Amino acid sequence: MATPMHRLIARRQAEANKQHVRCQKCLEFGHWTYECKGKRKYLHRPSRTAELKKALKEKENRLLQQSMGETNTERKTKKKRRPKSVTSTSSSDSSASESSSESETSASSSSEDSDADGSLSSSSSSSAYSSSSSSSSSSSSSSSDSDSSSSSSSSSSSESSSDDEPPKKRKKK
């Protein structure tokens, strides 16, 4: 039951509050929007979708820069590793070929020598070479493991590009 006194009090409070109210139409203080007699001011603001698109582009650029930085560091480390593995495999191949040729010569000399002492010394030397060749082959296998890991990373990148192709085919339909 709003008496005239209550209405008067409410009106005074509204007048007092008007001083702190901004009109949504003309963007001025001092009156309510429904009391506005001015024209609507045009305030240019980018749309929400434009702001979201801009934020998405920034995130994509950051991710691309991070991935490019990671691939650059991976390439640098791979470049450093490759020369080491190439030299180790070439040295292991040459040492393996030397050990096999020396073991053949020692085997032929042991067959020519009828002394037991000569055959023992040649067999011990061939076993020493075989152990060195096995260690070098293990180092070459570890380098081939690193090469296979780099090839698997390159194959995964080619697979990702092939993943992009099917949607293009779908768009052609």
Swiss-Prot record:
<dbReference type="GO" id="GO:0008270">
    <property type="term" value="F:zinc ion binding"/>
</dbReference>
<keyword id="KW-0863">Zinc-finger</keyword>
<feature type="compositionally biased region" description="Low complexity">
    <location>
        <begin position="88"/>
        <end position="160"/>
    </location>
</feature>
<dbReference type="InterPro" id="IPR036875">
    <property type="entry name" value="Znf_CCHC_sf"/>
</dbReference>
<feature type="region of interest" description="Disordered">
    <location>
        <begin position="57"/>
        <end position="173"/>
    </location>
</feature>
<keyword id="KW-0862">Zinc</keyword>
<keyword id="KW-0479">Metal-binding</keyword>
<dbReference type="Pfam" id="PF13917">
    <property type="entry name" value="zf-CCHC_3"/>
</dbReference>
<dbReference type="GO" id="GO:0003676">
    <property type="term" value="F:nucleic acid binding"/>
</dbReference>
<feature type="zinc finger region" description="CCHC-type">
    <location>
        <begin position="21"/>
        <end position="38"/>
    </location>
</feature>
<dbReference type="InterPro" id="IPR039715">
    <property type="entry name" value="ZCCHC10"/>
</dbReference>
<protein>
    <recommendedName>
        <fullName>Zinc finger CCHC domain-containing protein 10</fullName>
    </recommendedName>
</protein>
